Amino acid sequence: MLTLARQQQRQNIRWLLCLSVLMLLALLLSLCAGEQWISPGDWFSPRGELFVWQIRLPRTLAVLLVGAALAISGAVMQALFENPLAEPGLLGVSNGAGVGLIAAVLLGQGQLLNWALGLCAIAGALIITLILLRFARRHLSTSRLLLAGVALGIICSALMTWAIYFSTSVDLRQLMYWMMGGFGGVDWRQSWLMLALIPVLLWICCQSRPMNMLALGEISARQLGLPLWFWRNVLVAATGWMVGVSVALAGAIGFIGLVIPHILRLCGLTDHRVLLPGCALAGASALLLADIVARLALAVAELPIGVVTATLGAPVFIWLLLKAGR
């Protein structure tokens, strides 16, 4: 028994090391790749100081943090709702953040500061997450809870579309492109949003014990002495915060929170002590690679990263649905 535990521990360490190396390679490639390839030896040249340190580095850090936040949010929501298909984008949380953002633009008539827009996006994400939690407490079946989340997402998407369609504001029309997801406008001025993600990310990665209990189910968690009401509300607040900040920073990006936790679980990383940091590393790596594709796929324009992740993630999602139905 002890030997099996040690083997599993060594395997987990190997996975985390491999994911760390993958993330570092993706980060290095992201800093080098662009309209002009800049190798590490040229990073401190006048050209490198502009393109690498002022343009690519803030974007790369934002992509890394958002990818980690979305993947961890997916893992947390799957444990909270006891639903392997739970994910911020699929369950409407990202769209809720978008509704909060657009409502702020409409009510503020484009005069609100960036920090106020970010807080409104966070509030929208929290409201949708709390509604989903209310549905979960009614002990709905997995399929019905999933459908409820999809319906909330459709409602939020319809509200955003109506608002943008009837708006004469140029800023609001530009939000439609922004809601497809993209890091094109990220620079050091958004560093406060990046900093807002770090403490919540680190805190959630340290909460493996309650997450493992929640993954066992509500009855088992109660029997083990876990205060469900406290942890549910705290984790809902943390998830809503991460998704809201991510949407405020880069728009709606789907499938990262769904696919990454599933793939890691299929690889044997079921313990949240390993799954949560693994999700952070894998989510950051996946979104960095998707951002590189979005930047380089077309010579004349940049693809919305939400389109790239949806194109790559949709087939994986269909495969997961088919596998879950067997």
Curated annotation (Swiss-Prot):
The record's listing under SUPFAM superfamilies reads:
ABC transporter involved in vitamin B12 uptake, BtuC
Q: Which GO terms describe its cellular component?
A: plasma membrane
Which stretch is the leader sequence? none
Q: Which CDD domains match?
A: TM_ABC_iron-siderophores_like (cd06550)
Question: Which biological process annotations from GO are given for this protein?
Answer: cobalamin transport
Q: Where are the transmembrane segments?
A: 15-35, 61-81, 88-108, 112-132, 146-166, 184-204, 240-260, 274-294, 302-322
Entry keyword annotation includes Membrane: yes
Q: Which GO terms describe its molecular function?
A: vitamin transmembrane transporter activity
* Record note on quaternary structure: The complex is composed of two ATP-binding proteins (BtuD), two transmembrane proteins (BtuC) and a solute-binding protein (BtuF).
Q: What does this protein's UniProt record list under function? A: Part of the ABC transporter complex BtuCDF involved in vitamin B12 import. Involved in the translocation of the substrate across the membrane.
Q: What is this protein called?
A: Vitamin B12 import system permease protein BtuC
Per the UniProt record, the source organism is: Shigella dysenteriae serotype 1 (strain Sd197)
* Top-level taxonomy: Bacteria, Pseudomonadati, Pseudomonadota, Gammaproteobacteria, Enterobacterales
